[in-house]
Structure formats: C-alpha cells, structure tokens
C-alpha cells in the first residue's frame, strides 16, 4: 500500500503536465517576433508641448519638449523637426528645456511636464547635453517628478537652478528648488517647504545673479480629483544665491494660493510679475512689483488670463521693453502697458498655450508652445510655422478595425479622433493618408466589425 500511495501523486502530476505541455506549444515564443520591426504610420500632427527654448545667436534654431514624444530640434525656424532624445532620454514627458546663454552648446532638460492634466506622465530627472543635443547624459534628481523650470546662470553654464514640483501622484521629499555649481555632478536642495509642496518656477535676476525668485505650489493628481493649492505655497526670494529665503507677502493674496508663475523684466530688473491662482476669486490675477519685490499690487484680474490656472497661466516678459508682457492661456495675449490690459490677442495655430521664448536680439523672433505642438514666428506673431510636421501626437487609446489592410484609430489629446492606415498609399503624403474620424478628444473608440 505504501508504494501505491507513493505512485498516485506522480500520476496526478503527469495528468496535469500533459495538457500544460500541449498549451505551451501553442504560445508564441520570442523568436517568432524577432524579425518584426516597428514602422511609423503617422500622423504628422503635433501633440502637446509645455517646454521650449531657442538659441540667441542662431535665430532659426529652437528646441521643443513634448509631453510624450521627447525633445525635438529645428534649425530652419520650424520647417523641419528632428528628434534628438530617442534612445538617450528614457522618458517621453518633458517639463523644461533650457539653453545656456554663455555656451549655447550646453542644454539642460528636465523630464516630467509640470502642467498636470489627468493623463500626465512623471519624469525621471535631469539630462544634459554639451554638443547641442547630439548626446545626452543623465545628471540626477531621479525622483523629482515633474520639473517646472530650469534656470541657468547667464555667465556660467555649470551653475543651474531647478524648480522641482515633485511626485504629482503623492507626497515625497524630492521637491523644491535645487542648485548645482558643477554642471550637475552634485545637487543641493536649497529651498524646501514640505513633502506635498514643490517649486513650480525659478528665475534669476538678470542684473544680479545672486537674487533668485521662486514660486511654490501644492498640487497632487488623484484618480478622482485634483488637489490644488494650500497656504504653504507662494512667492519666495533669495538674495544670496539660495542660502536664505524670504516669503514675499506685501500686497499679495492671503490664504490659499495655487499655481504661480513669476518673471523678472530683463529690461528693468526692479520690475517683477506674478500670475497667481488664489482661492478667493477677487484676489487672483496678475500682480506686479516695481521695487524689486518689496511691494506688490494686482494690476489685472481678467479671467481670460488665469482660467484653469493649474494648466495655463504662464507669463513671459519681453526682453527689451519693460512694458510688454505676454500671457498664455486658451488664447495667447500681449500687453504693451505693463500688464494693465491685454487687448491684443495673437492667434497661434492651436489653442491652449503654455509659454513663449523670445529672442533678445530680435523680439520678432519667437517660439510658442501649446496643445498642438510648437510653432515659430519671425514677425512677432503675425504668422507661424506649421504644426503638421511634428509626429508627436498624444493618444489616449488605440483601436484597429477588421479591414485589410487595417486602419488604426485613436483620440488625440485636445485634437480630434484620427484614422491612420497601417499600410500607407505611396502616392499620397502622410497628411493625406490620415483623416479626422470624429470630433473631440475621446479615449474610447468602437469600430463596426464589418463596416
């Protein structure tokens, strides 16, 4: 009997092993896919970008950071774009791109877009190039989450400040203002508030490199809500290169504040601006200081400049005229009276704007970024380069139909539902091969199985 019971477990195992072996023979192995290659099928329609920069001495050279497609470069004012990050920068979400003024070969990129939609992807730190984007090295801050701004010392490319918003999905300590003095070999956190409040913006006084302006914001994305604002946020200033900080309060909103963008006027460093999202509607708006930040006053409360403040509400000062400032929101606006009015709307190829970079040698030359990509203007915004040359579309979900050759369908963020062929028609351009299959930016698409 002992031998019988010893044999039974073996029989049972054998009984189950035989069917499993049969099933495993039908499971595709890795070898089957070895000869398959990825093929780009389109579309050439730009996707969301929240990070841009340009090269002062090369007026036709610009950089674009997208929220899902990495870093791109143009050397012909936006007529053609080339990806310069694939295979080196390991995430596609880019929050900041900054080119050194003193050495234009040096570029810093911060990963993780800091305008936190619900479909945002987190970053994995800072990357650096010393050859205009040909090669990239990872230089730290892997847990900094979303990077809102990188500010490079105007005379020394090794001195860099980073506004780290932190993990957008939960609390962490790797957030605040960071500084390096050796080109990214070592980083020091120079201003920190809490594990739920991070830095959204950082600026260097153009006439005093030891004076630093920064904004802090409490924000977190949860599956069911957006946590936006607290009494910890605000505007902070350091006058000794980040060793000591003071919260600026005179004339600014009290209580809860959300996203804040700050800016020095390069033409008059005593003039500062802050676009502030405040809990009290009557306190939010554009604030200005004309005494270096000691006193502030609200000069504009127009809601078109600050709606959905957590997503838009960007400001950029003209490099040579202290009275000109640009505001990016659903529209792109220009003020010529120091921010009191924004009567001029500049029409860009796409709405939902996230900022502008202006060449200080010729302020008619600029690059704007928005939910449709990036576009270049050489005439102050009168006309722009196309966005139909950027394969950076941000799709929510992919569906295919049953025809042969099959077509692919997807809803593009802030664009339309699109249909793309799996096998393009050679006689047609990439633009002609795809078409809008429906409006809105839906995430789920259902295709009839036979029609």
Go through each PLM region and give its residues.
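Bacterial Sec-dependent N-terminal signal peptides
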Residues: 1-26
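Beta-propeller blade termini and top-face loops
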Residues: 25-451
């Amino acid at each position: 009997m002992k031998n019988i019971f010893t044999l039974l477990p073996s029989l049972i195992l054998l009984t189950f092993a035989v069917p499993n072996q049969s099933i495993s023979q039908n499971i595709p192995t890795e070898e089957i896919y070895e000869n398959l290659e990825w093929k780009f099928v389109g579309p050439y329609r730009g996707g969301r970008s929240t990070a841009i920069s340009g090269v002062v001495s090369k007026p036709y050279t610009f950089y674009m950071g997208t929220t899902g497609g990495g870093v791109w470069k143009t050397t012909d004012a936006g007529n053609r774009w080339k990806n310069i990050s694939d295979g080196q920068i390991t995430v596609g979400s880019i929050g900041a791109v900054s080119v050194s003024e003193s050495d234009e070969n040096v570029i810093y990129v911060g990963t993780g877009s800091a305008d936190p939609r619900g479909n945002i992807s987190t970053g994995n730190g800072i990357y650096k190039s010393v050859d205009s984007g040909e090669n990239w090295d990872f230089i730290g801050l892997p847990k900094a989450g979303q990077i809102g701004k990188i500010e490079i010392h105007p005379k020394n490319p090794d001195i860099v400040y980073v506004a780290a918003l932190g993990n957008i999905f939960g609390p962490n300590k790797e957030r605040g203002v960071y500084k390096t003095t050796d080109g990214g070999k070592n980083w020091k956190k120079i201003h920190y508030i809490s594990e739920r409040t991070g830095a959204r913006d950082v600026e260097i006084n153009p006439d005093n490199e030891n004076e630093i302006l920064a904004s802090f914001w409490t924000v977190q994305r949860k599956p069911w809500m957006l946590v936006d604002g607290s009494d910890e946020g605000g505007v902070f200033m350091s006058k000794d290169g980040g060793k000591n900080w003071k919260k600026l309060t005179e004339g600014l909103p009290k209580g809860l504040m959300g996203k804040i963008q700050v800016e020095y006027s390069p033409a008059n460093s005593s003039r500062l601006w802050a676009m502030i999202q405040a809990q009290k509607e009557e306190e939010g708006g554009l604030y200005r200081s004309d005494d270096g930040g000691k006193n502030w006053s609200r000069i504009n409360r127009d809601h078109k400049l600050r709606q959905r403040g957590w997503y838009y509400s960007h400001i950029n000062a003209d490099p040579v005229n202290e009275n000109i400032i640009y505001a990016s929101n659903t529209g792109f606006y220009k003020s010529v009276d120091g921010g009191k009015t924004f009567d001029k709307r500049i029409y860009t190829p796409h709405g939902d704007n996230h900022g502008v970079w202006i060449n200080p040698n010729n302020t008619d030359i600029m690059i704007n970024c928005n939910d449709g990509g990036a576009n270049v203007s050489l005439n102050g915004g009168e006309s722009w380069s196309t966005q139909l040359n950027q394969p950076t579309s941000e799709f929510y979900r992919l569906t295919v139909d049953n025809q042969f050759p099959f077509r692919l369908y997807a809803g593009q963020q802030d664009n339309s539902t699109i249909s793309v062929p799996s096998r393009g028609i050679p006689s047609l351009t990439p633009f002609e091969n795809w078409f809008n299959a429906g409006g809105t930016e839906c995430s789920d698409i259902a295709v009839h199985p036979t029609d």
